Structures are given as C-alpha cells and as structure tokens.
Amino acid sequence: MRGLILDPLGKIVELPIKSNFREGLSIFEYVASARGSRKGLTDSALKTANAGYLTRRLVDVSHDVIIRGEDCGTKSGIIVFKEDGERTSPFHDRILGRVAASNVVSKKNKKVIVKEGEEIEETKAKAIEENEVTEVTVRSALTCVMEYGICAACYGWDFSTKRRVNLGVPVGVMAAQSIGEPGTQLTMRVRHFGGVVMSDVTQGLPRVEELFEMRTPKNLSPVSDISGKVEIEKTDDGYLLKVKNLRVKPPEEREYFIPLATELMVHDQDVVSAGTQLAQGYLDPKDILKIKGIVEAQKYIIAEAQKVYESQGIGINDKHFEVILRKMSDKVIIETVGDTALIPGDFITKVKFEEINAEILSQGGEPATARQIQLGITKSSLFSDSWLSAASFQETTKVLTEAVLQGQEDRLVGLKENVIIGRLIPVSSDGEDPQELLQSERVLSTGTDTSPDKTSIEQQASDNV
C-alpha cells in the first residue's frame, strides 16, 4: 500500500492508494500514482541544478578561507553544549578534533581534563562525557583573529588525517563542498520515494538556501523586541499580543498580530525577555541579529541548517558551517564617516575598515564608525575585497565599473583571482607555508596599466613564427 500521494504542485491528494501493484490499481489510483512518479522524476532533474548552484555560491563566498598560520593567539571561542535544542548529533562528535579555548574541568572531582590550547582527541572526548561535563568552550573559525583566512588552532582537526590541519589547506572550499554535496544527494533521493507523502527533502534544500541567503522565511514567527509582560487579546482573525515594559520611563509597548491557525508559544501574563519567540514558525536571522547580536544569529543559522541535514541522517561537522558564517559576518556597514572617504550605508570588510581607520588615526583625524552586519552568501560574494573574484561571480559589468571608478586593488589572497590571472594558487597540501605566494607586489590594481607593451607583443609574435 503506497498511501497518500503528492500531485505535481506538491499538494496532498486526499484519497490514498490502498491497493498494491500485485493486485492491481483502480483507474484513479493508477493516475494518481503516475502523477506522483512523474513529480519524483521532474523534481530530481530540476532540483539537482538548485543544489549545484548552492554549492557554487558557497564556494564563491569562502574560496579565500585558507589556513594561513598555526595560532592566531585569540582567547575567545564558542560554547558547545551537551544538550543543544533539537540537535541529534552526539556531544562527543561535536567536540572531537577541536582545540579547547579554556580549561575543561570535571564536574565529579574538579580535575582538569583538557588544558587550554590542547586538542580534544578521542580519549579526552570520552573522558569529558564520562565526567558529566555539560559545556565546553572551543576555538572556532567564527572567533579567529587572523587578518586573511584562519589559523590551524581555530580550525582544529582535518578529518581526512585525524590530526591538526596543515598550513595552506583551502578549508573554505572544503566547507562549501561538505555542505553543498549532500544537498545534491538529498535532491536526487526524492526520486526513490515516487511522490509518496513524507518529509520531502526538496523542502529541506530551500530551507538551507533561505538560511544562507539571509532571506525572511515564509513561515515567519515574530520575536519580542523588548522585555516585558505579555497580554493576549483574541480577535476574529487571530491573536493580538502586547508586550509591555512598565519598568522604564516612558513605558515601552509593542504589538504583534498572530493568525488563528498559528500556535502560540507564550501565555497571557507571561514575562518574556527581548528575543523570545512568540509563536510557532521560523525566526528571521536579521531579527535575532538586531535584538540578540551576531553570536546568537550565527548559532541560530547553524542549528537550523543542521536540523535539515540531521533529519535525513547526514552528519556534517559544525566547523564547515562556521567557516561559511565567518565570511557572511566579515562585513560592517558605515554609520558615521569621520575624516575618511567612506560613504554612510556602504558595506566594507572589517579588515579594510580597520586599515582605513588606523591610517586616519595615525594622521590625527577622526575615525569612521560602523556596526557589524550579516549578509547572504550571494551579497557577501559581490562585496568581496577582491574585484576579480566578485566580477567572475555575478553582475560582472557593475562590479568592474565600480572597481575602476574607485581605483580598487586586488591583493590576490583567494583562489579564484589567482586562477583568473594564471598564477599559482596560494595553497599547499604538504604543510608548507603558502605565505611566499602572498608577497606585497602581488597586488593587481584597476588604477594602473597592467597590459604588456607593444614591443614585447611584437617580439613574442616574431619568436612564435
């Protein structure tokens, strides 16, 4: 018995298929089954392209994340919790191969299991679980302070060798392919179900895309902008939620309308904090960023993306998501310009912003101010520091025109820009330091004439003859 079937639009056909193929189907069941099978075939053909395109965008945003040093020296990290919402992957797997950002102390006897700066290998990961440790602070790509790329300590193990990652490994491309490739697998797996109603994976892939592009989700749930007491008023169309904070002067009040069909997650007279989810549905990462800050927004995106993959039994290490999110979060938006030549509302990388401010401060001027933002992968690629990489991705004419007008220079730190101009890419597979490939003269500027002179071209032509 095949059960309920999806029609070509993805809606459920109300009458299920009760017969089996041995006994034979009725006319209605046969037509419904054929439509379901056709949907499966067309889905796998069309949606494979979507998964491939997602991989391309992920590679484009992260190709310049390469291991550039052994240790950046940062003291910060991220906290990995044993009980982490709806995560199904074991605690052991989430801390294995990471570097501890602070001492991990046993809950039983207060002994130090892992010292700060040590790798959490198999025996230590087991000891952490046995000693009832509920949270571990580990180094992360999100908190690495390397100017370009990331350091080996913040990345941790390369799981192909089960030891610390070598210098020069292109971890950005590895992360993009680790996330994108299962997307292709998921999409192609739809065909095997032949339109039978179940958790259709093609609903999962658009969800991952939605998260990485920082889009406002369709099934949006409001979050409280302020802390305060909830008052719920039922109307004909839905619920009117009021959050009031009477402790401040003047008192604050926010109103939210929630449709009747949506399940509420708070009760009348509940006290909520800023950022509390008020109803069932997805949150907008931009709201979390505004209310709770960049760290909470990053945690939400990782948790939601992992939920999609883990529901299909696909295990992807968190560090791959962290590498992509590092690139999504490396821009700032200019608020005040000071004595710089920047424009309010411009997007600029943190590295470039700090360089410009340092130069202005050295001259005794007033620095610019900015706030950190999180961009979707497409937008982040287009606002890359490398105009060669951005132009080879999308909107080529626009990117090149702006690069010429601003006299931008390209430091050639990523893979794409070096491939385009025919140089060696700044990576190494055997642990050799790729820094020699990143010398200061390797800067390609749109403001200078880099074309060969006429005599050298004529000489080359005569040599070929």
Which residues make up each language-model segment?
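Intrinsically disordered, low-complexity regulatory segments
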Residues: 1-465
